[in-house]
Design a protein with these regions (language model features):
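Lipid deacylating catalytic domains
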Residues: 1-17, 21-139, 143-325
Length: 325
């Protein structure tokens, strides 16, 4: 007698949480460990440093996450990342920044002021007293990373609450060394045609002397030192945010640049001058981008993947738990 098909249990699989190799990004991690730990690692003959701690420090109160979009972006751009955090850490409060939705072509410092005002408004709205605010973390994409850094000095009274600064392909050192000529041409057109001040600032063409530029001034802001965790995420495939700029690193090509190399190196040093380097994690992401089109050619496809690649986001919130709780 044939077996009744209705009685056969059906396998239930959640394929999204375990993506296939065709869509799973490849991620390389770089971080620093204290000298004394290096000595212990050397003595124990371990070839890799110990993993990041999984047990977070206990805290009481609200952990507020602020998500900041990039150039010509919208508040909903980072909604998928927000959803991943909210599902795994339901006690967190998440806000998608709206302060600069229609103003990303203006002055980065003005955008920072608007963001700071918005953060204060959310603290007042969600935290009845200052004591109920335990932590503030930022998840930023593209230009949003520089906008956030411009806002941090204006939030100095909350600096003891700063917890995680997660930067997704943000050009912290600008666009001085962009290898993609098509992107460079596009930037030139936007600067000339739309008179975009923020793009002038990103290319350090807003002043004659680069040391008077907005980006150089911003590099002297030491507010990042107040964060317990700083994560700089980058991709070689993304030409909208140059690789070294997103990682705040100085390459050999930069040292060889007689025009901007010295200024570029100074900016990188100034950003990390007061930062505990053990708090910094750099992630290099390689996306599976199958389709060959203009977006993949100019690097826009990878830039957008930071907003759309759910496997990357899920890996992030499950692996780096101390960033989120």
């Amino acid at each position: 007698q044939a077996e009744d098909e209705t009685s056969v249990p059906m396998a239930v699989e959640e394929l999204l949480s375990m993506p296939t190799l065709e869509i799973q990004p490849i991620i390389f991690e770089q971080r620093y460990i204290p000298t004394e730990m290096c000595m212990r690692v050397a003595r124990s003959s371990l070839r890799t440093p110990p993993p990041l701690p999984c047990s977070p420090k206990l805290y009481h109160g609200v952990h507020l996450f602020i998500f900041v979009h990039g150039f010509q972006g919208q508040s909903c751009d980072l909604r998928l990342f927000k959803n991943c955090i909210s599902l795994l850490y339901p006690d967190t409060c998440c806000h998608l920044s709206e302060a600069n939705e229609r103003n990303t072509e203006g002055d980065i410092k003005d955008m920072g002021r608007r963001l700071a005002d918005e953060v204060r408004a959310k603290v007042d709205e969600w935290c009845a007293t200052e004591a109920s605010l335990a932590r503030i973390s930022f998840v930023v994409h593209s230009l949003g990373g520089l906008i956030t850094r411009a806002a941090l000095p204006l939030l100095a009274d909350f600096s003891s609450k700063f917890h995680s600064f997660i930067s997704l392909s943000s050009p912290h050192l600008g666009y001085m060394h962009n290898a993609n000529k098509i992107v460079e041409a596009g930037l030139w057109v936007l600067k000339k045609w739309k008179k975009s001040l923020s793009l002038q600032q990103l290319t350090m063409s807003d002043t004659k002397d680069p040391r008077d530029s907005c980006l150089y001034e911003l590099s002297g802001n030491d507010s990042l030192r107040n964060f317990n965790h700083i994560c700089l995420v980058s991709s070689f495939q993304d030409h909208y945010a140059p690789f070294e700029s997103a990682r705040v690193e100085v390459s050999e090509d930069t040292h060889a640049d007689s025009k901007f190399g010295e200024v570029y190196s100074e900016m990188a040093s100034r950003i990390f001058k007061s930062v505990d380097i053990a708090a910094v994690v750099r992630l290099d992401v390689i996306f599976k981008i199958a389709e060959k089109n203009l977006d993949s050619l100019i690097g826009r496809a990878a830039h957008i993947q930071f907003l759309e690649c759910i496997p990357l986001m899920r890996m992030f919130v499950h692996t780096y738990t101390t960033f989120f709780r």
